[in-house]
Amino acid sequence: MLLRQYINVPRLGEIMNLKELTVILIIPIVYLGVCGCFEIVPKSFYDNFSSYNVGDKAPFGEWKVKEGGFKIEAILSEDKKTLNKVAVPINNGIIYIDKNYTDFKFIVDIKRLEESDSPKIYFRLINNANAGYYIDIEGFDRGYVLYKFNGTKVEKLAESYDAAPAGTDFYRYEVVAKDNKIIFLAGGQKYIEYTDNNTPILKGGIGIGGGRAYYDNVRVEPIE
């Protein structure tokens, strides 16, 4: 009697209430997962292609192929002292990371093979990269153009007739996407700022390719 007096032994009704509470807590979580209402924000992403072998062809790592092909090559660093692995399109190929980034900074280093080349930067890609936005880095440093596309439909949204003097050197390009505003920078200088008020795409993956160039140091950083 004394032992039972000091030990809190749960009654049957209390056990049932605990089970009911567990069910009540689990059902909404399962529902959120099934309906897609609950979504985990993707973490930051970085790839300098050093973990792959020279000659590897996409898909590799987290990269998927949208069209054409991509391969890993080794080229001399800018100081010509070491070999550096980079990603190169095959037949103007495009590869992409299939994640739902909403607000983010997307940074990539690009080096044209020839001054006439026009590589591209893709972002907020959806539907297996069949829709989204891209920046066209025009050849001969003529400028930059922001496009929105859906399948074969392509719409020019904004452009800059000024451009950084990249030539055939590695240059750092950056896209900042927050809500429906898009900012494009080259070498830290802003060249395009555009607000898409016509059914904007507010989340999606990122991609590279669409023109002859070396790509390196691809980075995506979510922003608040």
UniProtKB/Swiss-Prot annotation:
Q: Does the keyword Manganese apply?
A: no
Q: Which residues cross the membrane?
A: 21-41
The reply on keyword Membrane is yes
- Spell out the subcellular localization from the entry: Membrane
Q: Which UniProt keywords apply?
A: Membrane, Transmembrane, Transmembrane helix
Q: Which GO terms describe its molecular function?
A: hydrolase activity
| Protein name (Swiss-Prot/TrEMBL) | Uncharacterized protein MJ0945
Which organism was this protein described from? Methanocaldococcus jannaschii (strain ATCC 43067 / DSM 2661 / JAL-1 / JCM 10045 / NBRC 100440) (Methanococcus jannaschii)
Q: Taxonomy-wise, where does this protein's organism fall, top ranks first?
A: Archaea, Methanobacteriati, Methanobacteriota, Methanomada group, Methanococci
